[in-house]
UniProtKB/Swiss-Prot annotation:
Single annotated GO MF: flavin adenine dinucleotide binding
Cofactors named for this entry: FAD
Function: Is involved in the reduction of 2,3-digeranylgeranylglycerophospholipids (unsaturated archaeols) into 2,3-diphytanylglycerophospholipids (saturated archaeols) in the biosynthesis of archaeal membrane lipids. Catalyzes the formation of archaetidic acid (2,3-di-O-phytanyl-sn-glyceryl phosphate) from 2,3-di-O-geranylgeranylglyceryl phosphate (DGGGP) via the hydrogenation of each double bond of the isoprenoid chains.
Protein name (database record): Digeranylgeranylglycerophospholipid reductase
Entry binding sites for FAD: 15, 34, 45-46, 48, 99, 123, 279, 291-292
InterPro entries given in the database record: DGGGPL_reductase (IPR023590), FAD-dep_OxRdtase_2_FAD-bd (IPR003953), FAD/NAD-bd_sf (IPR036188), Geranylgeranyl_Rdtase_fam (IPR011777), Geranylgeranyl_reductase (IPR050407), GGR_cat (IPR054715)
EC number, as in UniProt: 1.3.7.11
Textual note on the cofactor: Binds 1 FAD per subunit.
Catalytic activity: a 2,3-bis-O-phytanyl-sn-glycerol 1-phospholipid + 8 oxidized 2[4Fe-4S]-[ferredoxin] = a 2,3-bis-O-(geranylgeranyl)-sn-glycerol 1-phospholipid + 8 reduced 2[4Fe-4S]-[ferredoxin] + 16 H(+); 2,3-bis-O-(phytanyl)-sn-glycerol 1-phosphate + 8 oxidized 2[4Fe-4S]-[ferredoxin] = 2,3-bis-O-(geranylgeranyl)-sn-glycerol 1-phosphate + 8 reduced 2[4Fe-4S]-[ferredoxin] + 16 H(+); a 2,3-bis-O-phytanyl-sn-glycerol 1-phospholipid + 8 A = a 2,3-bis-O-(geranylgeranyl)-sn-glycerol 1-phospholipid + 8 AH2; CDP-2,3-bis-O-(geranylgeranyl)-sn-glycerol + 8 AH2 = CDP-2,3-bis-O-(phytanyl)-sn-glycerol + 8 A
Gene3D superfamilies: D-Amino Acid Oxidase, subunit A, domain 2, FAD/NAD(P)-binding domain
Source organism of this protein record: Methanocella arvoryzae (strain DSM 22066 / NBRC 105507 / MRE50)
Positions bound to a 2,3-bis-O-(geranylgeranyl)-sn-glycerol 1-phospholipid: 370
Amino acid sequence: MKSEYDVIVVGAGPGGSLAAKTAAEQGLDVLLIEKRQEIGDPVRCAEGVGKAGLQEFVEPDPKWISADIKCARIFSPDGTMVELSEKMAGNEVGFVLERKIFDRELAKMAAKAGAEVQVKTQATGLIIENGQVCGITGKRHGDEFTARAKVVVAADGVESKVGRWAGINTTLKMKDIETCAQFLMTDINIKPNSCDFYLGSKYAPGGYVWVFPKGDREANVGLGMLASHYKGKHPIEYLREFVADKFPEGKILETVVGAVPVSGMLPKLSTGGLVLVGDAGHVSDPITGGGIINAMSSGRIAGNIIANCIRAGDVSAKALSRYDAEVREALGKSLDKNYKIKEVVTKVSDNTMNVAAHSLQGVDFENVTVTKLVKEIVTRNPALLKELVGLI
C-alpha cells in the first residue's frame, strides 16, 4: 500500500466499488478499502433490486442472482393479498441477489479497472489541512498507517463516521432510522418467483416484513421498522413471532441485523476533498429502505465528478458541490416524493390498510400510479380521504 493516491474510497459496498471503478476508469490512482476481511459479508439487506436499474450499471450474471422475480404480493394485516406485476412493484423487485458474490464482483471490477483493493483495512480518522480533507489515518491488519489523497469518498454505510469527521451532519432522527433484522431460512413454503410483503402493527409497526426467495424452499425473511415505533420489543423479537406463525417448520441458517436511513438525502453530500455515497449520504429509498441501485448511481456520479475536479486541479468544496447537484438531479425528486409518502403511510392504521386492500381487489394495476391507486381507494371508501390525503 502506498502513502499517496488520487482517491481513497472508504467502504467496498456497491456505492464505494462503483465510485472506485469509475474513478479508476478515468485514469485516477484509486485505493478502495474495506474494514471487514471479506467484501460482501455479512449481508445486511434483503438483496432485492429492480432489473432495469441494475442493468444501467452491470450486466446481470447468473452466478450472483438467486431468484428471478415476476411479481410482488402485499398482504394487509388481515391477510388480504394485493398482487403487483414486477413492473409495478418498485425498485426492489426484479432480481434477488447473492450479495456476498455480487459485492465481490463489483470490487473485482474496480480492481480490473486499476483500483487497489485492501480488506481488513479501516479508516480511523481524516487528515484535514486548512479546512480541506486530504487523506486518512487508518489501521491495516492492526498496523497504523497514513495515506494522503486529493479526494476521500465516504462509502462506509449508515453508521458512517467519515462524513462526521469532515464536519457534515449525518445525524438521523428516530423516525428516520429503520432497524432491520433478517433470517436466511430454508424448508419453508414460498412462491419462488414472488417477493412478499406483510404489513401491520402485529409483526412490524412502522414498517413491513419481507420474504424474498433465494432458491428452492429458501428465502430471506426479514423486517424493517422505524425506531420511533418500538413498543418494548426489538425487531428480531417481532421477526421470531412472524416466523413462528408463518414458517413454524422452517430452519434458520443465518441471522443479520442492521439499520437503514429512511430520511431522504442529506442536505450536504460533499465538502472540500470529500464526498459521501450510498447509505453514508442517506440516498436509500425512504419507503422500502432499499439502497443498492441508488448507491451505485451515487458512486458512479462521484467517480466522474471527482475525475473532472482532479483534472481541473480544483477539489474545493465549491468544485465538489457539483456532485451534490448531480445526485440531487438524478435521485432527489424520487427520494423527496417517497419520503412524503413514508410520512403518511407509517401513520396509517391497520384498519385503513385492510379496507384499502379490500378496495383494490379486482383492480387492473397495469400503468397505475400511486396517486391513481389512492384515488381508487378513496372513491370506493370516502371515509379514508383524511388518512390518505397526503398521498394524492
